[in-house]
Structures are given as structure tokens and as C-alpha cells.
């Protein structure tokens, strides 16, 4: 029966080949082949895109991920904290709910060691250790500071008690017995405090006021010659100028013409150097500056009067007639007690072309030769000018012109008289 059915099936198939249904199947198979061809092209295109994406991913893994490792570390740290919190909640809920462990954590730790939990734990421990050390160091510093304040306060208190005892104790005679004073009959504590206050005022006056009432000795008596006028000179920036260089260090430069100035002024003036510098600085300089002894007296800082932060030269203690005293200085604050006795000279800064001392010689010579009774009148006139020496030069120039003009007029008046005499005598 099967053999009889096979030819029948074949015959049916052969019959179907000649029918329109066969053509339909053929068209369907062709369309399916075309669709497969398009799908194969699309698959190749997707394969190429996937290959390029793999290359980009490999490049990103080699370059961008190491730079982004700290950010990934922070994300992992947050996720780990969240996981631990979730685990605690799950433990509270039930023992069967076990938290899931991220399977990629060991892989990330191998790829990026800096993001591993072990490194995070070590860094946290080091940070805590540093904070603890800093806190301990701050505590030690604060203890040292408190100890320093305590020592300083104790020293100040001890110094205060010592000052009260030392400056407040009464004076004693050669036998060691206390000398009675105005505080003897007062309570003991009050005695010491008031004596200390009196001592403070004494040292304050010693600093502010001159060391002695008469700065200069009395004028010389005959047969010795006492110059009529007294010339008071500032040393710094009038006679010498301090100069400092790397090669020589500090040294004092002589003003141009200072030797001639001292020699000429010593003929008519009693020369006194009065400066606010210390004696240990002044005396060696004047010894080298004036080997001939033209400078008769030297007054230093202890002879000044300290007023409003300035060392002022108080001429009242000079023991000389102020009508005959001329002070040459560039600092107005140093002579503000007696401005009418001051002749302001420009401050010398060490330049070699300076010639003001030569003009000053001429000015002083005129005063001495004219026997001016009160030099303050002349000095008061020149005090109104910013540069008295320049004004003196201008006055001398005008005086010379006036003298020449007077001489010319005198000569012009004399010539007609000679002509008239010769006309009368000679008949011409």
C-alpha cells in the first residue's frame, strides 16, 4: 500500500508544478533570499560598529578610568555604607534575608588598588592618627603658653615688690641708721609707696631736664680773654655727616671748609658744640675733627631738655648773655625754646660741592666787626627766610652794587670840581 501511495504523491507534486501555486512559492522563496541578504549586510555593519566600540572602550579603560578612580572610590564607599546599613536593617527584619555582596568588588580592587576597602581603611586610620597627634600638640602648646604666662606674671609681681622695697626704703647715714624724712611718721606701706613715687619723679626729671643748672662755667676773667660772642654749633649734618658703606662701615665725613671755618670763627667767637648725640660718639669725633682745640666746650645729650619727644637745647642754662649767643642748627625742634637766637643752616647730606660754611664765615665776621649789641635782632630778620644763607648772599650782592653805585656817583661829583679848579687856575 505504501508503494502504491508513493507514485501517487509524486504525481500530485508533478501536477502541482504546473499550477499557479508553484509560482507563488517561488516568489516567496526569492523574497526570503533577498531579505536574508539585507539581514546579512546589516549584521556585518553592526559587527563593525561593535568592533569600534570595543576599541573605544579599551582606550577609555586605559586612560579615563585611572583618572576617575577617586570618584569611583567615593561611589563604592557610599555603596558599601549603604550595604552595611541595609544589612543591619535586614538583620533586624529577619535572619533569612542575607544581603547580597557585589560580585565585582574584588575585580575593581584588583584593577584599581587605590579604591580597595583596605586602602580606604588605612587612610582613615592615618587621618585619625594625624588628628590625634595635632590635638596632643595643641594641648602641649597651650600648657607651655600657660606656663609662660604664669612665669611672666610671677616675675612681674616679684619685680613690683622689689621695686617698692628698693625705691621706697628710707636713706641711711654712714652708720646705717635710717634718716628721717617727710614720710617717716606715716604707715609703713604708705611710706614705701610714696618714697617710690618720689624716686620715679626724680628719675623722670633726670631724663627730661639737663643734668646741671649751669652748662658752661662762668666767663673768663682778665687777664684771660673772653670772646664777646658765643657760637653754638650742632655737630651732626653741620660739621660732619654720618656715612655708611659696605667697605668701610660707619664713618663721619667732614663738611667742605670746616677746618677753615673753625679757625676763622675762633678769632671772634667762643665756639661750643651742643648736640643731642651721646658723648661716647661725640668726643672721639671732635678729637679727630679739632686737633687744634678751637672748640672750647662740648655739650651732649645729658645737657638737653627732653620736650615732646625732642631733645631741645635750652639756652637758659648756658650761663651766657643771650644777646651775644648765636645758635647754628638745621633742626627747628632742637632750638624751639629760643628761635630768635637761631640761624637756620641747610642740612648737609654729604655732597662735596657744598660751600655754605664759607658764606657763614662772612656772615659771622660782619656781626663781629660791627659789634652788634643784640644779635637776636639780626637773626630775627633772617629767620623769616627759608634759606638765610642765600638771602645773605643776595643782600651782600645788593650792598656791593650800592657801594659801586655810590662810588661812581662820588667820582662823577669829583670830576667837575677838578675841571672847575683847573679852569680857574689855568684859565682854561
Swiss-Prot record:
Chain intervals with Basic and acidic residues compositional bias: 124-138
UniProt cross-references to SMART domains, sorted A to Z: CPDc
Molecular-function GO terms, alphabetical: cysteine-type endopeptidase activator activity; protein serine/threonine phosphatase activity; protein tyrosine phosphatase activity
Keyword entries, A-Z: Membrane, Mitochondrion, Mitochondrion inner membrane, Protein transport, Transit peptide, Translocation, Transmembrane, Transmembrane helix, Transport
Transmembrane segments: 59-79
Keyword Protein transport: yes
Record-linked CDD domains: HAD_FCP1-like
Protein family according to the UniProt entry: Belongs to the TIM50 family.
Record-given protein name: Mitochondrial import inner membrane translocase subunit TIM50-C
